[in-house]
Amino acid sequence: SARIAPKMEAYIFPGQGIQQKGMGMAAYASSAAARKVWERADAYTRKELGFSILQVVRDNPKELLVHGSPQVHEKGVIHLTQFTQVAMAVLSQAHVAQLREAGRLNPDAVVCGHSVGEYNAIGALGDVLPLETIVRTVYERGCEMHRLVERDARGESGYRMGVIRPHYAGLTEADADALVDAIAKETGEPLQIVNYNIKGRQYSVVGKIAAIGVLKERLE
């Protein structure tokens, strides 16, 4: 006889990078539970933070005034980390509310998050912190991250993020580390592996645009 292990379900909350205009708005239109989350968050961001998270997600304006200070990004302000992180937090809680509303939320599922997704996992399924606290926390986190890097008039910084796929390039982890270190020394520009996401398969890299460009050339 054979034994079949029970199916395991997991709810995984991602970090930044998947944000886009209109995300979550289909659920906003079709799910009362999701809409309630978005409207609760929007009321809080309007009153306490000086902007509308619904406006950010729906319209993705290239410029937004927050307490009289212009926030600018040529691809839309949803790509500024302080707004990205709030949008991701609200989206996560809205998705969970929609699942719960439909009776499809598994209380025995594994829950995890990556980077800002850790906060969202705690907020959406951990029953540890209320929505408003999560929104405030990730907004302040994003503001600090934003302030750490100089930006031009378009809201762009001189830094970029990339991904190394070592198994595609025939590299070991040590090879990848050495390559990144060598390029940083050659260019005199910051370049560093910041997350070893999947061993031997996916590493996140950040650095100045010139150094990222050299890394791309070496891997092609």
Residue ranges and their predicted role:
Residues 2-112, 205:
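Helix-rich "cap/lid" substructures immediately adjacent to catalytic or cofactor-binding pockets
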Residues 17-18, 118, 210:
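Gly/Ser/Thr-rich loops at beta-strand to alpha-helix junctions
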Residues 37, 120, 141:
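Conserved short alpha-helix immediately C-terminal to the canonical SAM/SAH-binding motif I
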Residues 94, 122-124:
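Active-site signature of alpha/beta-hydrolase-fold catalytic machinery across serine-
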Residues 94, 116, 214-217:
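Generic structural signal for well-ordered, non-membrane alpha-helices
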Residues 109-114, 136-139:
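Beta-strand segments within the central parallel beta-sheet cores of soluble alpha/beta enzyme folds
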Residues 114-122:
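Glycine-rich nucleophile elbow surrounding the catalytic serine of serine-hydrolase chemistry
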Residues 124-220:
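Alpha/beta catalytic cores of group-transfer enzymes, especially the acyltransferase/condensing modules
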